[in-house]
Amino acid sequence: MQEGIRMRVISTSHRSHKTMLPWLVSFGLFMENLDSTVINTAIPQMAHTLAVNPLSLKLAVTSYLLSLVLFMPISGYLADKLGTKRIFISAITVFTFGSLLCGLSTSLTMLIIARIIQGIGGAMMVPTGRLILVKTFEKSAMVNALSNMAVIGQIGPAFGPLLGGALTSYLSWHWVFLINLPIGVLGIFFAYRWIDENHTAQTPSFDIKGFILFGLGLVTINLFLSLADNRLISLKLLEVSLAIGIISLVTYYFYAKNKTYPMISFSPFKTHTFKVAVLGSLWIRITVNSLPFILPLLLQINFGYSAFISGLLILPYGLGLISAKFIIKSLLRYLGYRRILLINPCIIALIVLYFAYLNPMSSIFLIAFLCFFAGLVCSIQFSSMQTLNYIDIQDQEKSQASSLASVFQQLAMNLGVCLTALSLEFFNVPLQPQKTLISLHAFHSSFVFLALVAASSTIVFQMLKKTAGLNALQTT
């Protein structure tokens, strides 16, 4: 009898820990996404403290993103080789240590090195966390688990401008990074308690040649995207960077096809739902990821709001992200994946298009409402795409699928910010030859461009079968 009671206690404890896993993993994504945006509002004070030109601090942003993209592909291999629990805890530790170094930085060089360390931790933290959920939950529960992760993770970019402005204004820019320390320590503690070890019994040797080819391609293409709007960079250097990137990735593609165990396998693309979800998400994420970047600029540069007030106006975006969690499962059951992924991008496009009609006299309540509605539909889109990624993926391919999806998501983030910056630069030329500020015309034209990009993603999602994801929804 005592043995039976003990087993029931253990079973109840296990279910409780399993229930908390999505929230634990979500905070890893939250920290990574937060660090991608929170630094932007702190750049002027950082430049003053470090005695450098504010434009030089762009390296602190791009070094973090490049580090993320470069080391993401090896996260799946390390998780299979050493175990998901060990890698997830190590990733949080590295990320937290990098955050400490960022907060203690006294020079631009030290800050860049610290940001690279941060990126290495973040690169392994999110794909491994997502893999933990995919391996822990059955299809029926995976929809809800990944939905929770998507919602919490996307709060980072939404709250980044507000948090960065508040910390910089009332404390100092160092706290933009030091705030990660208590979150990281708690994450390590609960990861030890809640995560069960999971690794693949037989793991092939590490693909060094593939890592070099794939990494070189990603780094050079990301350099091209990050520096394309910088007039100080020669056109020749940009052309060479793009050419090296394309050649490296094409070479890797043919190399991987002929290798039994490549570092990153494109075999998940043979699964129709994964292919459509990832390629479609690349388009829609360009628009969605650009909003936390372009909206603070519009509100501060053209509407004259302070960094803190503009952050408050964008705060409803984060509330919209959270609110979607309570309706996503019902929407998926009622409409199915295909209908949602065809209708939702059009709604996103209409909202973004409406931003093009805003002006300095627009009501702050209208701005807040649009931000809330944008967050709501964007969260529905993220949750739907993320769960669809893995619904039909076989167990042996889940590690590769997780890494591949993460790389595409990071590329989409870079594309969103870079294309938005290029659009603002392009449409600003006729009206602002001195480049002292960005014209309202440039913002409005950029919103129209982003709306068209969002709507075009329906071309990809239309390839989904009507029955896509139906089995998982019927068992939820």
Segments (PLM) and residue ranges:
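Structural signature of transmembrane alpha-helices in multi-pass secondary transporters
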Residues: 32, 61-64, 68, 95, ...
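Central cavity-lining transmembrane alpha-helices of secondary-active solute carriers
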Residues: 62-76, 126, 130, 315-327
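Helix-loop-helix hairpins in multi-pass membrane proteins, especially solute transporters
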Residues: 75-209
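Glycine/proline-centered helix-kink
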Residues: 127, 148, 154-165, 218, ...
